């Protein structure tokens, strides 16, 4: 399989399928896809980092709440996933719905899901 074929196959995957692929790769190769965390060595460096405003957020579904069907419908609207994928995502909460969303997009998604009873976090 050529590199281009692999990239094309990945482009055609849903978010849920990509998540399963990442988990399978982590298990197969004994690695983690989590970004390495830099430790601030000096107090000045930590202060400068705190002054910068975060521009990209991950929208995480923390809990579906009691209105699961409404949450699944809202997740489908927000992510464009099919019914099966959206249900699996909601059932598997906490799960990331959208990565690197702008603050406005993140807040809009959060508001839409909280409106139907879900608990959502911006990280």
UniProtKB/Swiss-Prot annotation:
Top-rank lineage group of the source organism: Bacteria
Annotated Gene Ontology cellular component terms: cytosolic large ribosomal subunit
Q: Which UniProt keywords apply?
A: Ribonucleoprotein, Ribosomal protein
Database matches in SUPFAM superfamilies: ClpS-like, Ribosomal protein L7/12, oligomerisation (N-terminal) domain
Q: Does the keyword Ribonucleoprotein apply?
A: yes
Ranges in a coiled coil? none
Classification via InterPro entries: Ribosomal_bL12 (IPR000206), Ribosomal_bL12_C (IPR013823), Ribosomal_bL12_C/ClpS-like (IPR014719), Ribosomal_bL12_oligo (IPR008932), Ribosomal_bL12_oligo_N_sf (IPR036235)
Which processes are annotated in GO (biological process)? translation
Any one GO MF annotation of this record: mRNA binding
Q: Please name one Pfam family that this protein belongs to.
A: Ribosomal_L12_N
Cite the record's note on assembly. Answer: Homodimer. Part of the ribosomal stalk of the 50S ribosomal subunit. Forms a multimeric L10(L12)X complex, where L10 forms an elongated spine to which 2 to 4 L12 dimers bind in a sequential fashion. Binds GTP-bound translation factors.
Q: What does this protein do?
A: Forms part of the ribosomal stalk which helps the ribosome interact with GTP-bound translation factors. Is thus essential for accurate translation.
Tell me its family. Belongs to the bacterial ribosomal protein bL12 family.
Quote the protein name from its UniProt record.
Large ribosomal subunit protein bL12
Gene this protein is translated from: rplL
């Amino acid at each position: 399989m050529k590199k281009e074929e692999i990239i094309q196959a990945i482009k055609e995957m849903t978010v849920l399928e990509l998540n399963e692929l990442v988990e399978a790769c982590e298990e197969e190769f004994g690695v983690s896809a989590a970004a390495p965390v830099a430790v601030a060595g000096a107090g000045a460096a930590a202060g400068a980092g705190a002054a910068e405003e975060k521009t990209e957020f991950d929208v995480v579904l923390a809990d579906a709440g009691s209105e699961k069907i409404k949450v699944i419908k809202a997740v489908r609207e927000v992510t464009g996933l099919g019914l099966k994928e959206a249900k699996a995502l909601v059932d598997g909460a906490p799960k990331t719905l959208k990565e690197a969303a702008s603050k406005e997009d993140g807040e809009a998604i959060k508001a839409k899901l909280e409106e139907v009873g879900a608990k959502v976090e911006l990280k």
